[in-house]
Amino acid sequence: LLDSAGGMAIAAEKPDPRAVIQHAREHSVGVMGIRAVAAGSLTSVIDRPDAANSAEQIDFERAAPFRLIAAEMGISPAQLAHQYALSMPGVETLVLGVKNREELAECLAAEAAPDLDMSLMQRIDAAVRD
């Protein structure tokens, strides 16, 4: 789920962004992450008008355990998604797709927070594994 292309999937083969990040690290190339909230799938609510039965809606439903982890931590799912992405070794920065000040504040809080520890990242991975 965390690596889902959602509705942007156009190739028959499944993307493997983690392999790309690892390859970039091996060659000392920084990575600019995109889609940290997976087109809204890793947020509190899908706010797209055409979300019903979309790839994003399917991913949103599969991300319920992710939202529970965020709630346990006392932060929004969007903040956790951004913290997760920024905590990935090799990811240097993120492209933000914010629509309002609240979303921007979540991103700034994620950037100011310490990296997530590996055990929490593994727990998140296990909770939303394909």
Please identify what each model-predicted range represents.
Residues 1-129:
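Beta/alpha (TIM)-barrel catalytic core signal, keyed to glycine-rich beta->alpha loops juxtaposed to Asp/Glu
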